[in-house]
């Protein structure tokens, strides 16, 4: 291969790398502005593909063909780089537009200039490659492979290196620098390339047009590829989670298959033989459709395969990411390699013309237009209406049908090949692809630390023991409800997001009740519906209106299985359900809330992570009344201490006064004014039968049980989070760091670090009947929960204030549990001196006898 071609291939490789970097950054910036709904995602993808299709079509004009291809390509790259640097303010302004349809239109228009330039690059470079005796399909296959190979590196370098190093927006400078390198490098090397303008005249008697069948084929290939990609992305999120790393690995693997397929096709294509090219193209469609359907069958075993990998990587992030690549490759590579072959094969089937660039432009434009249609229809329509499996099946059948049409029109029609394609259609129609939903919905990846102790047989039995009550592939997530014994679990993309188990039940109810200790809220916003328990808890209070924001309609459907626990909040006229992206809705809503509860609890999940940033907390704060409160829930499990400190510090930056409650599930309450808790109000809440019963159901039988769940106050937060960095939309700190520690168990060490800064709860209480009584109640609750140090401190302070039988008895019990026998005996004797009822005295006397016995402790 000549040095000229090597240089052009290298330039196109770098162009693909920069293009995918831009796509990732622009997609994230746009979704932050217009919301991360399925329609928004589809619109952004379609805007990219559609803009590139327009660019390719424009590049096919003879007016463009007469330009110097190297200079034109260099200019296109330079323009894209400049536009990338200018784009952030343009994209940011879209957020201020209220109407979503106008936002979508503006997003499309904002991307058009750059994507048109990107789409024009392949047809332009094809003309530079025309100076060769090499078959056109070979050169174009190599070009396409080089560009796609660069695109493979784009998401990997962006997520694994550029985002963590320089942040989201500065990554645009990295991409722009690559484009500028290509631009100026080509211009400087132009003399060595020896290329100039090309005269375009059709060969005598031959047409420069492209057969409609070829346009339809590459268009359908592009559409089916995007349907597969969207469906596979959802499938893989149920197998190994949807962290930013998993998503980038999935995208890179998808593109890798296309690059390999195109490169191999270019390598093995021979000289033209009449009719053979069409047959080869049809066979590529048959292979892609067949492998797509086979991927559904393979996916059934992938959760168990992931667990096998987990046992070997033992928490290593690098091995985890490699296992994600292997799993993604098993699903996608065979099909995408066949898809990668379609464009070179279609070029090979073109009629001869002196304007090869124009023909390729039309083909490439049709392929990209199909991709745009496939992306939009899959994201906004197919997955929600047909589901994952049947969307893939529909796309596969369409591809096979097109293959039959091509075979029938081919001069070298093969009965055998036609029979294979027809049989494949019948087989796909006959087989039910929806098997394995239970295994995928079970979410083996999320509990891998526990499940790794089981052999595969036992694990399969455990999965089978979970009855699948509900399953729906929604626009943004796959939602399931599973039941084992009396426990029901809400699964979103395989991860348990809610359940009626004791731990989850307590947290879901508590975040609906706890904020009312700080404010008598009348208008409340709840971000995330989940099981509906939190909204149900809020509605037990005398609120005037509750706005509940949920992005996934299937979650609302699934919540009906939790009506015994949530009280069917949908029937309450005070509730307004808002289906959409909460962040976007809060930004455009001019109303004010006394209380906002942010229920999503997983900072490592893509699409959820932007609800834990400084930017979101500022948006939420701007929608609170002067005395308003934001309540934030997040899990400690799977979080490192550094990530936990960063999240709390970010919350603290926005809210001057912060109190943290609970343990493995941490609940933050933030306000502009000091957070104080009225003991009188707390008792009144418990006196309300509906609220008291709800709290008791959550395992909080007494008011003091709520109080002792306080872990940090503002002073403790400052000490715990000292010098912790902020988590922002731009640095993506939590989204990038949390997935790396997902399988670590740092909960105990985090809680131990927090205990060093345990607050004096009494200092945050008002309307106390007496401090001695309150401290005695706190000591009792601490004692019950096993926090003996805190129990002892409050019991001693209670006794120091007032000597009472109950106070002395409790102090003696705590000291006995701590093994301090002599001090326990003295406290219990003090209880007897203080009086007490007969039954209580008998209990104390029995304890004293136990302490006096040789085995007493």
Language-model features, listed with the residues they occupy:
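Start-of-helix register in tetratricopeptide repeats
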Residues: 773, 806, 839-843
């Amino acid at each position: 291969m000549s040095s000229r071609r090597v240089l052009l291939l290298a330039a196109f490789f770098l162009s693909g790398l920069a293009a995918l970097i831009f796509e990732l950054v622009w997609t994230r910036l746009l979704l932050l502005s217009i919301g991360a709904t399925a329609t928004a995602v589809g619109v952004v993808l379609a805007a990219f593909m559609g803009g590139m299709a327009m660019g390719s079509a424009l590049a096919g004009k003879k007016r463009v063909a007469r330009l110097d291809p190297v200079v034109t390509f260099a200019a296109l790259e330079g323009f894209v780089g400049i536009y990338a640097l200018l784009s952030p303010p343009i994209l940011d302004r879209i957020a201020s537009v209220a109407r979503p349809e106008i936002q979508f239109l503006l997003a499309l228009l904002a991307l058009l200039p750059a994507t048109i330039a990107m789409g024009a690059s392949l047809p332009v470079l094809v003309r530079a490659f025309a100076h060769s005796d090499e078959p056109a399909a070979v050169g174009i296959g190599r070009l396409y492979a080089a560009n796609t190979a660069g695109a493979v590196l784009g998401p990997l370098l962006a997520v694994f290196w550029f985002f963590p190093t320089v942040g989201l927006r500065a990554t645009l400078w990295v991409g722009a620098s690559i484009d500028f390198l290509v631009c100026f490098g080509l211009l400087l090397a132009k003399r060595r390339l020896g290329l100039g303008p090309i005269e375009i005249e059709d060969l005598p008697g031959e047409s420069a047009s492209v057969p409609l069948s070829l346009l339809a084929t590459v268009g359908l290939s592009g559409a089916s590829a995007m349907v597969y990609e969207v469906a596979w992305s959802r499938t893989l999120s149920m197998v190994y989670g949807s962290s930013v790393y998993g998503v980038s690995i999935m995208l890179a693997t998808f593109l890798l298959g296309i690059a390999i397929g195109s490169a191999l096709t270019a390598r093995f294509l021979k000289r033209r033989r009449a009719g053979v090219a069409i047959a080869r193209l049809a066979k590529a469609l048959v292979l892609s459709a067949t492998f797509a359907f086979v991927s559904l069958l393979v996916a059934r075993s992938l959760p168990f395969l992931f667990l096998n990998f987990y046992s070997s990587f033992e928490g290593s992030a690098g091995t985890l990411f490699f296992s994600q690549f292997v799993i993604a490759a098993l699903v996608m590579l065979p099909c995408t390699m066949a898809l990668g072959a379609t464009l070179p094969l279609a070029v090979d089937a073109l009629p001869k013309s002196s304007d090869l660039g124009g023909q390729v432009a039309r083909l490439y434009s049709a392929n990209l237009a199909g991709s745009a249609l496939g992306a939009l229809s899959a994201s906004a329509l197919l997955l929600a209406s047909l589901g994952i499996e049947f969307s893939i099946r529909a796309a596969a059948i369409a591809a096979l049908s097109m293959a039959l049409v091509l075979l029938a029109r081919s001069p070298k029609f093969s009965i055998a090949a036609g029979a294979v394609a027809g049989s494949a259609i019948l087989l796909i129609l006959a087989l039910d692809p929806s098997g394995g939903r239970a295994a995928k919905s079970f979410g083996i990846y999320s509990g891998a630390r526990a499940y790794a102790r089981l052999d595969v047989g036992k694990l399969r039995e455990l999965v089978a023991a979970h009855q699948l009550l509900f399953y729906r592939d929604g626009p943004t997530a796959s939602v399931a409800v599973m039941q084992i014994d009396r426990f029901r679990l809400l699964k979103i993309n395989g991860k348990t997001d809610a359940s009626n188990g004791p731990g989850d039940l307590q947290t879901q109810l508590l975040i609906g009740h706890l904020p009312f200790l700080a404010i008598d809220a009348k208008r409340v916003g709840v971000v995330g519906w989940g099981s509906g328990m939190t909204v149900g808890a809020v509605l037990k209070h005398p609120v005037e209106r509750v706005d509940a924001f949920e992005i996934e309609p299937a979650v609302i459907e699934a919540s009906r299985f939790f009506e015994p626990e949530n009280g069917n909040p949908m029937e309450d006229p005070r509730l307004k359900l808002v289906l959409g992206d909460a962040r976007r809705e809060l930004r455009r809503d001019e109303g004010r809330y006394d209380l906002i509860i942010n229920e999503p609890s997983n900072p490592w999940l893509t699409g959820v992570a932007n609800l834990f940033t400084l930017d979101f907390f500022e948006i939420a704060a701007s929608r609170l009344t002067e005395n308003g409160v934001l309540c934030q829930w997040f899990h400690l499990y799977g979080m490192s201490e550094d990530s936990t400190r960063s999240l709390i510090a970010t919350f603290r930056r926005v809210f001057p006064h912060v109190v943290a409650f609970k343990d493995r599930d941490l609940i933050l309450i933030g306000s502009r004014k000091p957070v104080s808790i009225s003991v009188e109000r707390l008792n009144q809440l418990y006196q309300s039968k509906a609220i008291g019963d709800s709290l008791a159901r959550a395992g909080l039988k007494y008011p003091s049980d709520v109080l002792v769940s306080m872990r940090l106050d503002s002073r403790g937060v400052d000490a715990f989070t000292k010098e912790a960095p902020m988590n922002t939309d731009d640095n993506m700190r939590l989204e990038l760091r949390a997935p790396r520690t997902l399988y670590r168990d740092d909960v105990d060490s985090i809680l131990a670090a927090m205990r060093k800064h345990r607050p004096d709860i009494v200092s945050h209480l008002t309307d106390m009947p007496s401090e001695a009584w309150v401290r005695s109640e706190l000591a009792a609750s601490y004692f019950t929960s096993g926090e003996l140090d805190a129990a002892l401190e409050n019991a001693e302070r209670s006794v120091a204030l007032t000597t009472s039988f109950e106070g002395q008895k409790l102090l003696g019990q705590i000291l006995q549990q701590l093994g301090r026998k002599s001090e326990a005996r003295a406290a219990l004797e003090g209880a007897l001196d203080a009086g007490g009822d007969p039954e209580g005295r008998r209990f104390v006397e029995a304890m004293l006898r136990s302490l006096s016995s040789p085995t007493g402790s």
